[in-house]
Amino acid sequence: QKDLIIKNLDLKKNSVLSQDLEPILETSLNYLDPIKGGYKGSPKFPTFNLYETLLYFYNKTNNKKYLDPVTLLIKQLCSKGIYDHVEGGISRYTVDEDWVIPHFEKMLYDNTQFILLLSKYCKINKDEYFRDKLDQTIQFIKKEFLNKNELLGSAYDADSDGVEGKYYIYNFDEIKDIADIGNYFEIE
């Protein structure tokens, strides 16, 4: 038993808990897209765990180099095509580097991580725009992921009737048929 205790103490010395993570974060920052957010290139996955870590280090150090990438990512996620501006929630990823063209799969896992990061961010940035996206995403999960027994489903498939994104794509005539939207866009 003494050997086991010594072995566990040695493991703790080498664990992530006893290491300085800032050099690792510095390396990670070099891979981030300073203009579009997220990692450079495409496809674009939000990688929430990295951004939660950056937010943690911002709260610990008050160094904006950790907050700025989080702010950029959240702005991109909330304003671009990865976010469903009609029903709320985010898609799994985008196929382009601009966060515009979503892969239409929506996963509970991604949306709960989005909620967690966004709720922590809203404690720092009080802008109602982000709070609205947070609330809309929570409502989306309650409406679309809860079944009649109040159990959560895990994902929405990207395909509808065998076509990726079919559920989300409208043609011109379908848009005209939506109540009052024609007046908004001055469509005749």
Report the location of each language-model feature:
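Replace the tail clause
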Residues: 1-188
